[in-house]
Amino acid sequence: MRHAVYFGTGDATTAPSPKTTDGVMAVDIDTGELLWAYQATENDVFMGGCGGEKKSLACPEENGPDMDIGNSPMLATLPDGKRVLMGGTKAGDVFAMDPDDNGRLLYRVNLAGGEPGGTNRFGGGGIVWGGAIGQRYAFYGDGGAGLIAFDPATGKPAWTFKPADRVVLGAAPTAIPGVVFAGATNGTLYAVSATDGKELWSFDTTQTFETVNGIPAHGGSIASTGAVVAGGMVFIGTGYGISSAAAGGNVLLAFGVE
């Protein structure tokens, strides 16, 4: 089905949860007609404000486990010409479907641990944000501190990069030929080899910068969105205020080739 739009879906907020929650859906690009749906986690009813002792009338009786798809699926073309559609869950599962065979499941493997409450927690594993596709491998950031490379055809892990200080690589990675960029919740931007996961360089963004528009700026935590590569430069926003690993910030940084 090459005339389709694919997207991930979140938790249900009331029970019973529909079969279209916590999964991936395909719709016709012209009509919006549902073509197929795959549910990764059943009966996952969750509301972010219902985790404490004080609950409102709108809170579901069973809250969680919040293991939905918190990121966009990835579409890859394999060397043999076949296509695979991959998704990652907050439970740490990576799954692949055949988008040209009604979403038939090809594999499902756990690569990143995972724990309940993946929306608001870092450190317990799981795939919270998006991934990237390189020349040979696909990549996901691990909520438990790491960057995972795996074969998109089989789901078999190739290598894992874990920073020395065990910070969480919470942002979506960005892949270009030979290099993967990954942002960490402590404000460090890493560049690692796409082949073997060895660190090429890193940069601490939690510092004060002189900006081109004259406004004082300070970097902070990097999470959610990843780097953008364009015109031979790498751009990254730093200052994700929800994470406690580094203070909030307000700066957009651009890196060039020396």
State the predicted function of each range.
Residues 8-11:
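Generic short beta-strand segments
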